[in-house]
């Protein structure tokens, strides 16, 4: 029996916290149109994601994918690190 998996949401965002073990907080920035004025307004939503090997560091650009609930707040997992942060 070959059942096909449902499509899962994939987001790209910046790591804003990596202080937890095997967990990162990713801020995904996007925009919405203001209902009255029609201007595009930027906003960010933060997601907690599972990082099994602690690969992602602060300010890295990462890709996360929706998955089953892993804890009370984690619903995403790290797919890959797109761009490493520049350390000065």
Swiss-Prot record:
Keywords: Ribonucleoprotein, Ribosomal protein, RNA-binding, rRNA-binding. Pfam families: Ribosomal_S17. One of its GO terms (biological process) is translation. InterPro entries: NA-bd_OB-fold, Ribosomal_uS17, Ribosomal_uS17_bact/chlr. It comes from the Bacteria. One of its GO terms (cellular component) is cytosolic small ribosomal subunit. One of its GO terms (molecular function) is rRNA binding. Part of the 30S ribosomal subunit. HAMAP family: Ribosomal_uS17_B. One of the primary rRNA binding proteins, it binds specifically to the 5'-end of 16S ribosomal RNA. Belongs to the universal ribosomal protein uS17 family. NCBIfam families: PRK05610.1, uS17_bact. This is Small ribosomal subunit protein uS17. It comes from Oenococcus oeni (strain ATCC BAA-331 / PSU-1). The gene is rpsQ.
């Amino acid at each position: 029996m070959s059942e096909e998996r449902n499509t899962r949401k994939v987001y790209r965002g910046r790591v804003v916290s990596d202080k937890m073990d095997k967990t990162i907080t990713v801020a995904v920035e996007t925009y919405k149109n203001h209902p009255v004025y029609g201007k595009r307004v930027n906003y960010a939503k933060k997601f907690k994601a599972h990082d099994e090997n602690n690969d992602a560091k602060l300010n890295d650009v990462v890709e996360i994918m929706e998955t089953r609930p892993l804890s009370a707040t984690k619903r995403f997992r790290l797919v890959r690190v797109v761009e490493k942060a520049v350390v000065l």
